[in-house]
Design a protein with these regions (language model features):
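Secondary-structure boundary elements
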Residues: 2-72
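Active-site neighborhood of thiol-dependent amide/isopeptide-bond enzymes
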Residues: 54-112
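His-Asp-centered catalytic microenvironments across diverse enzyme cores
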Residues: 2-7, 12-19, 98-193
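Residue-level signal for well-ordered alpha-helical scaffold segments within enzymatic catalytic domains
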Residues: 45-49, 86, 90, 116
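Generic marker of "main functional regions" within proteins
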Residues: 34, 53, 57, 61, ...
Length: 193
């Protein structure tokens, strides 16, 4: 993994990772039990299981700000990663955003996930939500991924952990108001470049 920012930036708030918002703080306080590993597991399972994946659910709402994702209870993979990272940072756990480029029909789509510093080790964690064919379990010891990119298909794991959402991703989310149409019409980013 490469890091796009200074260590303290992985605890900072921004317009999407608004971990100082009362909604994020309330959820974080409800999830805080035990050590950082237990807290990270609780936050992961909360976002994975209690925030629906908009495309899976056919939900038209487009959320991108962590507090909105948590209050609305829905979001695409990117938005769910924003919420997870915000919860981790609210609990004092360094966390950032990661991306993968995956095959999607005849083209590609960028998939969003998170990385966190747990027990002095960075692991990538994907809270996108389970469904048939996808069953991601929390791990503090190794990456917990929904998808394993296949380089033979042109897929890739982007190696960088970002402290803030990639502008390409955030611009797409902020410029649409219908998630179903955005997904069906191929408006999701196909690359970060």
């Amino acid at each position: 993994m490469r890091f796009a920012a200074e260590p303290w930036d992985y605890l900072a708030a921004d317009e999407a990772i608004d971990h100082e918002h009362p909604v994020v703080q309330q959820v974080a306080s409800e999830l805080r039990t035990g050590d950082d590993v237990a807290y990270a597991r609780n936050a992961f399972e909360y976002v994975r299981d209690r925030v629906t994946h908009s495309q899976d659910a056919g939900d038209r709402r487009v959320t991108w700000r962590a507090s909105d994702v948590l209050s609305e209870g829905t979001g695409l993979c990117y938005a769910k990663a924003h919420a997870f990272v915000a919860l981790l940072r609210a609990g004092g756990v360094q966390a950032g955003l990661c991306y993968q480029r995956l095959r999607d029909g005849d083209g590609f789509v960028v998939h969003g996930l998170a990385a966190a510093l747990i027990d002095d080790r960075w692991v990538r964690l994907d809270p996108r939500g389970n469904k048939p064919g996808i069953d991601v379990r929390f791990s503090a010891d190794e990456d917990a991924l929904a998808f394993r990119p296949d380089p033979a298909l042109g897929e890739e794991d982007y190696p960088t952990v970002y402290a803030a959402p990639h502008p390409t991703v955030l611009d797409v989310l902020k410029s649409h108001d219908d998630c179903v149409a955005m997904c069906e019409n191929g408006r999701l980013p196909s690359t970060l470049e």
